[in-house]
UniProtKB/Swiss-Prot annotation:
Residue ranges of coiled coil: none
UniProt source species: Psychromonas ingrahamii (strain DSM 17664 / CCUG 51855 / 37)
Broad class of where this protein is predominantly found: cytoplasm
Subcellular location: Cytoplasm
Protein name: Regulator of ribonuclease activity B
Amino acid sequence: MEKALSLEELLAEYREETEEIVEAILEDGSNPDAVYMIEHHLSCTDFDVLEKAAIACFKKGYEVTDPEECELEDGSIILSFDVTVEMNLDEEAIMEDIEKLVVLAQSFSIDYDGWGTYPEE
């Protein structure tokens, strides 16, 4: 059985991942000064818990998407929603949101599944 990562270890992994994502986006020629739609992904298998987490995110001032069903590679179904933030591609600002959302996700026993965005010209 894998040992669960501490919050500090988890955030260190997300920091490294964030640096890699931002670097890859900029290397692909995206505009470093553009405003990006950052999508943070949260999920679990219990709709009621997911809904409560989405409401908590909304109350903290975040925009949230409607919940969706997602089928995983093994055929199991999870429920997810995104927290969306329009911002520059600023690693520190992204990490601030990641830290807040990871802590919130842990408080509801749901998963923070990382973030993504789309290239901007």
